[in-house]
């Protein structure tokens, strides 16, 4: 039985000294940085209705055991090495996946952004799925 966390509003802007979350984590507020967080032992998702204007990177995050939903975020993913489930990159400008070795599920992309990604060094257990998303770079889009 996993523990679940949900960060709401703007009370927490960093994970500070926390290195691991043992469970699922949902973020519904604006983050500044990931502090020392390197592993999430469950799903990690960002709310689809909050634009992460201050979060420039998820560094030092290396592993998400479950699904990782980064829809409507634009943070650098250069430290990310493994996602155990699906990786949702729809409506993002998260193009630097240079450390990503493995995705245990599907990768979801906005069709208009797909040419910006290189998955040649990534083992993908599922498939790459494309979506016809309305997309405005560095802005929250509803559809």
Give residue spans per PLM region.
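Extracellular/surface-exposed low-complexity segments
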Residues: 130, 142-143
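Concave beta-strand-loop units of leucine-rich repeat
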Residues: 2, 23-33, 42-55, 66-76, ...
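Short, T/G/N/S-enriched strand-turn elements that build extracellular solenoid repeat scaffolds
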Residues: 10-19, 31-38, 53-62, 74-81, ...
């Amino acid at each position: 039985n996993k523990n679940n966390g949900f960060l709401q509003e703007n009370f927490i802007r960093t994970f500070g000294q926390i290195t691991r979350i043992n469970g699922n984590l949902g973020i519904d507020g604006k983050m500044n940085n990931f502090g020392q967080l390197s592993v999430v032992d469950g799903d990690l998702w960002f709310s689809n209705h909050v634009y992460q204007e201050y979060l420039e990177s998820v560094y030092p995050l290396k592993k998400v055991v479950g699904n990782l939903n980064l829809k409507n975020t634009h943070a650098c993913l250069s430290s990310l090495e493994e996602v155990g489930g699906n990786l949702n990159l729809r409506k993002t400008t998260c193009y630097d996946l240079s450390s990503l070795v493995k995705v245990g599920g599907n990768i979801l992309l906005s069709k208009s952004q797909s040419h910006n990604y290189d998955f040649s060094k990534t083992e993908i257990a599922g498939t790459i799925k494309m979506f016809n998303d309305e997309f405005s770079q560095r802005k929250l889009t509803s559809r």
